[in-house]
């Protein structure tokens, strides 16, 4: 019998090809824009006055007429409460010891976990800075009956129109927020389930999506899924700031005198329509008119699917030019403002933002907790070590009227 790879298998070696390969999208456009306007703050909460109304004690009169009644300027107080983000790792002593050195492993376990957590924190924040404080990942579909089950039909949340599983992966621990009522913060929210672990997530052939939990879970139609403990604890996002209703930073947008606290929203009642240059210009002009600044929009941001729609508008006349960013990257523009695209952005939506009006308030920047002099701590009764990252602060705009959001844009995912 001739020698073959089968008979010689015990002698053959594996040839290892260097470092760990990255396959995850690490682009964090919104985080980079926000972090460029970061501010160090402190105290119980952030407070600043906002001028929302003029003194209208003016008018013309006849000779010797009674002077206008004295009025006053109108101010409101905006408040920003801090939020607290954490990222935690744990590595066994065996994994640490057995991964030391290039000959033992592709990467040392503790260094790899700490480095990946640092990157993951940026990616987590990037998603959060779009979708905001409620922490939506997806919702239970309308055809899901209210039962104890392990397999749950899901659909996109109202702020995550499109693929409902793009922020879900196996191993996540989720809470289900009750969709009924008018919850606006942690004190008013109720849950349909808590701390359920995702075993798998599947997109079916028909486009239906399911999440399979590791144990039976009580679900109802419309339940909003978030990472456990994160409901209304996430940092505020641009969807919170670029809105025209509700209360933002303690100021009611419903009050007529506070209309300058409303952002510019161009929707189509939930029906998608083609993107046009005229639609973009309408939104641009709305923000310019509301703010009194012709070039108030500094960036437009959208999902990659909308980039294709935008390029289709420009290609027939070859009217697009690309700006060059640091590192040589090229970006499109509209009216001279950068038009940026990334995977975490909501589908079917274009944001127009005034970057100087947005602030990433930092009480504590991203850091590994080491008040006791060590980043790592022993886990009680186990030969294992753990550490955690943290960042305290919040995110928001002090001029919502300088920003716009176009929704219901037709785009192929």
Q: What spans do the regions from the language model cover?
A:
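Core alpha/beta structural scaffold of self-assembling particle/tube/pore-forming proteins
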Residues: 1-59, 67, 71-413
């Amino acid at each position: 019998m001739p020698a073959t790879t089968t008979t010689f298998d015990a002698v053959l070696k594996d040839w290892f090809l260097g470092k760990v390969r990255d396959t995850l999208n690490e682009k964090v456009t919104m985080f980079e824009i926000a972090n460029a306007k970061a501010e160090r703050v402190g105290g119980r909460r952030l407070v600043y006055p906002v001028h929302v109304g003029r003194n209208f004690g003016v008018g013309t009169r006849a000779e010797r007429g009674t002077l206008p009644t004295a009025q006053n300027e109108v101010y409101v107080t905006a408040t920003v409460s801090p939020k607290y983000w954490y990222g935690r790792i744990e590595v066994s002593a065996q994994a640490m010891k057995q991964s030391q050195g290039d000959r033992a492993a592709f990467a040392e376990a503790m260094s790899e976990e700490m480095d990946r957590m640092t990157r993951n924190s940026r990616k987590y924040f990037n998603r959060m800075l779009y979708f905001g404080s409620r922490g939506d990942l997806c919702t239970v579909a309308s055809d899901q009956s209210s039962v104890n089950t392990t397999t749950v039909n899901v659909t996109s949340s109202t702020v995550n129109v499109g693929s409902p599983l793009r922020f879900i992966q196996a191993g996540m621990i989720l809470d289900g927020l009750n969709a009924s009522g008018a919850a606006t913060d942690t004190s008013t929210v109720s849950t349909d389930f808590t701390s359920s672990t995702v075993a798998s997530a599947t997109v079916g052939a028909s486009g239906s999506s399911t999440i399979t939990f590791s144990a039976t879970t009580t679900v109802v139609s419309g339940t909003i899924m978030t990472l456990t403990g994160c409901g209304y604890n996430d940092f505020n996002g641009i969807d919170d700031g670029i809105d025209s209703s509700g209360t933002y930073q303690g100021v009611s947008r419903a009050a007529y005198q506070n209309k300058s606290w409303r952002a510019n929203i161009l929707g189509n009642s939930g029906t998608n329509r083609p993107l046009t240059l005229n639609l973009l210009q309408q939104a641009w002009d709305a923000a310019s008119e509301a703010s009194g600044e012709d070039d108030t929009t500094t960036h437009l941001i959208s999902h990659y699917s909308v980039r294709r729609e935008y390029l289709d508008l420009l290609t027939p006349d070859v009217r697009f030019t690309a700006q060059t960013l640091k590192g040589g990257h090229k970006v499109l523009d509209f009216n001279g403002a950068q038009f940026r695209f990334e995977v975490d952005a909501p589908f079917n939506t274009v944001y127009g933002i005034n970057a100087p009006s947005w602030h990433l308030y930092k009480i504590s920047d991203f850091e590994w907790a080491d008040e006791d002099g060590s980043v790592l701590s022993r886990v009680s009764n186990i030969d294992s070590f753990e550490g955690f990252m943290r960042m305290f602060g919040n995110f928001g705009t002090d001029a919502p009227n300088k920003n716009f959001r176009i929704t219901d844009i037709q785009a192929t995912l």
